[in-house]
Amino acid sequence: MSTIISIRDLKKQFGDKWVTQGVNLDIPEGMMTVIIGRSGEGKSVLLKQVIGLIHPTSGEVLFKGINISKLSDRELEEQFKHIGYVFQFAALLDSLNTFENVGITLLENGMKAQDVLPIVKEKLSLVNLSEETLYKYPSELSGGMRKRVGLARTLVTNPEIILYDEPTTGLDPITARVIHELMYDMQKKLKLTSVVISHDLEIFKYADKVALLNDGKIAYFGDAKTIWESDNPYIYQFIRGLPEGPIQTEVAHFKDKF
């Protein structure tokens, strides 16, 4: 099992608050790794440090052995051709139709619309969207369809890795399962590496590895298939939703007042 991303002692400070406080994590190539943790724990900040949207205070991120934390913006842009990012909300431009939203990167780089069209059609097919959606606007699409359009847009650059930030936020359980299955199928079919931030424990069915972020550090890293059997106190408490344990929660503090 080879490592495609290595995170080494990654720290990030905003003002007087430390968000990540020495994260160490190896992301295995060709697998789905899910990162879980309390709300406000800094999972999205961690992901954005991985792709250079936020620069770490200290530490490093290695992509295929290259320390991307030290690269210039131009060098980062070159590396990011290999990495796709799916935002928590689809982040589609309301003024653009599906074709334009999916193909925007190619169109902005000077490709002709007639050359972009077959590429967009192919990516829409991969996420199970028909050509009928090509010229529809985000307001005409369901929440699940917008998520899939966002994924198709990520696929346009043929990434090796896709980072997902809460991909099923705002979706009902049925649609969320459809998105999870799609993510899994895409990973296997295209031989992708997936890193997923999620609060939806159903994702464990499709994941290979699970990492738990707590107090700015990785408190657990292990196999998703055996996670319910783990006796790690942090993961035991978190996946069962227990208010008491090593993870400090607002609920526990509230109970202490009575």
What spans do the regions from the language model cover?
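Conserved ABC ATPase signature
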Residues: Y137-L141, M145
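Conserved catalytic motifs of ABC-family nucleotide-binding domains
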Residues: N158
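Conserved ABC ATPase "signature" region
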Residues: I66-N67, Q114-E132
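Conserved ABC transporter NBD signature motif
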Residues: G59-N67
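Catalytic Walker B motif of ABC-type/P-loop ATPase nucleotide-binding domains
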Residues: I162-D165
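Helix-to-loop junction immediately C-terminal to a conserved catalytic motif
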Residues: I51
